[in-house]
């Protein structure tokens, strides 16, 4: 087995990953797994750590944290271009860790590591976003779910919040605040050749099935089918949205009259309002944004 680089976000899940890492490290050592590791020290640090790992010749990089950590590792590993020689892995540890749900990995990090050490891989689709950030064009990859609207506003507010209370309390506070203040926004959305102009509560561009800590947002999504599943929550009242949320966990929201599901390989999103774009729960920029899919571009352990 080639040497593995493990990139650990010790503050993920309110510090639980940092507490679990010594046990995971001990497990890897007991199995004789050749590995190096690096601990992230600040937001976006995993991007540079993954890029440095590639520069040092590592071919297998595993993220131990949440979906945000995985997103950073993904972007660092492919900083110099999408490479078929790089194999990625993800160990659930963050508040959401939704991509590993789609992979079917155990929630326990040691059991998940034992599973991926079997060496099975699959080719999964890669999403690419082009948007604006601080007045310049920004490109970002994602592998699970991206989008805009309500969820992006919650993410933006949470990311700006002080970290002294961990991640859960600021998230719940900003979720409640956004529920009180958020209104549907006007969007222009182009799905391949189909153009929609409408007011929407949120727009989700999904490669994986889950987001938001187990919400079954795209039940029909497949990681390797070469297309996005786009879920649009059309203009609705706060009460309609609140009553819809429990259905998302069951996947039955897709039958709601104000939820529309589309398939597309290319998605354009724009608005006359300033709208944030999130990928794996991290704000990557603002609209206008273009989402493209690279079919089966990533070799992933599962």
Segments from the language model and where they lie:
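Short hydrophobic segments within beta-strands
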Residues: 7, 91, 231-233
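Catalytic core of DAGKc-family lipid kinases
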Residues: 31, 40, 79-201
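Glycine-rich phosphate/pyrophosphate-binding beta-alpha loops
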Residues: 147, 151, 204-217, 283
């Amino acid at each position: 087995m080639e040497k593995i680089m493990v990139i650990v976000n010790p503050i993920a899940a309110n510090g639980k990953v940092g507490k679990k890492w010594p046990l995971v490290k001990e497990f890897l050592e007991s199995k004789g797994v050749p590995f190096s590791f690096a601990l992230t020290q600040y937001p976006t640090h995993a991007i540079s750590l993954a890029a440095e790992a590639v520069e040092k010749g590592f071919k297998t990089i595993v993220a131990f944290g949440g979906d945000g950590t995985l997103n950073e590792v993904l972007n660092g590993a492919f900083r110099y271009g999408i490479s078929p020689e790089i194999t990625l892995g993800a160990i659930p540890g963050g508040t959401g860790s939704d991509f590993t749900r789609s992979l079917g990995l155990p929630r326990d990090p040691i059991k998940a590591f034992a599973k991926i050490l079997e060496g099975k891989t699959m080719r999964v689709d890669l999403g690419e976003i082009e948007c604006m950030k601080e007045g310049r064009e920004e490109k970002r990859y994602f592998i699970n779910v991206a989008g805009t609207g309500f969820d992006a506003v919650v993410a933006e507010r949470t990311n700006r919040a002080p970290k002294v209370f961990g991640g859960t309390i600021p998230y719940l506070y900003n979720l409640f605040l956004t529920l009180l203040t958020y209104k549907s926004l006007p969007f222009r959305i182009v799905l391949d050749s189909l153009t929609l102009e409408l007011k929407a509560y949120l727009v989700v561009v999904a490669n994986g099935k889950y987001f938001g800590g187990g919400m079954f947002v795209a039940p029909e999504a497949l990681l390797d089918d070469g297309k996005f599943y786009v879920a649009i929550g059309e203009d609705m009242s706060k009460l309609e949205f609140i009553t819809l949320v429990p259905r998302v966990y069951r996947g039955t929201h897709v039958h709601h009259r104000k939820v529309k599901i589309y398939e597309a390989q290319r998605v354009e999103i724009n608005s006359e309002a300033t709208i944030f774009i999130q990928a794996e729960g991290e704000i990557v920029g603002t609209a206008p944004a273009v989402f493209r899919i690279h079919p089966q571009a990533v070799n992933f352990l599962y």
